[in-house]
Design a protein with these regions (language model features):
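Short terminal alpha-helical segments
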Residues: 1-40
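Amphipathic protein-protein interaction modules
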Residues: 49-106
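Alpha-helix boundary/N-cap detector
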Residues: 22, 46, 81, 85-89, ...
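Residue-level detector of well-ordered alpha-helical segments, enriched
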Residues: 26, 43-50
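Short, surface-exposed loop/turn segments at secondary-structure junctions
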Residues: 37-42, 66-70
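Short, solvent-exposed segments of well-ordered alpha helices
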Residues: 38-45, 77, 81
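Amphipathic alpha-helical elements of HEAT/ARM-like alpha-solenoid repeat scaffolds that form extended
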Residues: 6-14, 48-55, 122
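Low-complexity intrinsically disordered segments
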Residues: 87-131
Length: 131
């Protein structure tokens, strides 16, 4: 399994976003941490990817496989927010996570069987957010 939500850390990020009192500011912070990092840590990468996935779900109605039962209802309820100003940062953060300076990418690269699928999944999200 190589999806955004195939990791416990991703669910921690989702729980934090769902509990956020200022989701736009929190997402921007998660993206900025990744974009500005010399080396992107595992947790930071997940927080940025989950933020990007939520934006993708809200703006593009993209359906992610997610074990959180109310994910789709919750993302629908976020349509009142304008996430479009964050799209470029999300795209940049995904690019950074796929770069050589990313712990998450390094770990996935060790999985010869699923690395390409994981990478393509993130590139597809990035492409949708560029539109």
């Amino acid at each position: 399994n190589y999806g955004v939500f195939d990791d416990d850390t991703a669910y921690d990020a989702l729980i934090d976003l769902k509990g956020s009192s200022d989701i736009i500011a929190d997402m921007e912070q998660y993206f900025d941490e990744v974009i500005q990092a010399e080396y992107i840590g595992y947790d930071e990468a997940h927080y940025a990817l989950v933020s990007a996935a939520v934006i993708d779900s809200v703006i593009n109605s993209f359906v992610y496989r997610c074990d959180e039962e109310d994910y789709f209802e919750w993302t629908s309820s976020q349509k009142c927010f304008d996430f479009s100003p964050l799209k470029q940062k999300a795209v940049t953060a995904i690019g950074a996570i796929l770069s050589d300076n990313s712990e998450l990418r390094e770990l996935w690269e060790e999985n010869e069987e699923l690395y390409e699928a994981w990478k393509e999944d993130k590139l597809s999200m990035q492409k949708r957010l560029q539109q």
